[in-house]
Amino acid sequence: MDVRAYLNLVRESGGLVSHAHPFHEAGYIPYIRLLPHHVDAVEVINATKPPVVNERAAAYAASYGLLTTAGSDCHSSGARRLGGIEVKRRLTSIGDLIGVLRQGDFRVFLNVKD
């Protein structure tokens, strides 16, 4: 299935698509691919990426009116930088998370441990 068709299927089925670290560059990624009309949100804070990459993602999200998300991308303990979203109530299901994101009732954050 084509990636656009897959993303559309997720959204048509009630899911929410957030594009994680859209400007990440690595040897195993042949090119940066942006699909602003097929996603709902963009990860604008990734704790492991340089600020310029996060700033680029934030500008991308803003230019298309997309929701924003954040994450740590932490694959080991002892991370010095942590990112995520803060919500006002306890979430008990994926449906709760999707609802909070769609309503914009959250804030993204980045914490740096000294």
Language-model features, listed with the residues they occupy:
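Binuclear metal-dependent hydrolase catalytic cores centered on His/Asp/Glu-rich metal-binding motifs
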Residues: M1-G14
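Charged catalytic cores and adjacent phosphate/nucleic-acid-binding surfaces used
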Residues: N8, L16, E25-D114
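Short, well-ordered beta-to-alpha junction loops that form the rim of enzyme active sites
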Residues: H21-P22
